[in-house]
Amino acid sequence: MPDSTAPDPRLAVTIEAIRAAAKRLNGRVDRTEMRHSRALSEATSAEVWVKYENDQYTAAFKERGALNKLLQLTDNEKQRGVIAASAGNHAQALAHHARELGVPTTIVMPKATPNVKVEQTRARGAVIVLEGETFDDAYAHALKLREQQNLVFVHPFN
């Protein structure tokens, strides 16, 4: 069964999609500070502001994307659970928000993932599968488990 929210890579992100995501996330993630970057502004000859997403609970910008995806799942998909391949920030963000929403989560990580990342993700409620030597190996295994266990794949960057 295909996921109801599987991204279509041919579609561009629209301002309407951004506004809808902002509405879904309102009050669910921290509103983080923006700071002017003089160095980046000088390097690009443009005014550059940097958003401090490292102030989020898991110290990463990945929280917005992971939570936005989870909030768009159907009740059936939430019950089935989600799976992702990640060796760090996406894993922790997804595990954190999935636990808050009561969604079972499996994270596939490469075998060489630092133990601190594995344990931080496990502490946030995810089932951890260590598979493969590289991220690509872990990613391929996550897709295989998705099919075998009828899970919803949450892509780490799409």
Model-predicted segments: where are they?
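PLP-dependent amino-acid enzyme catalytic core
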Residues: 1-158
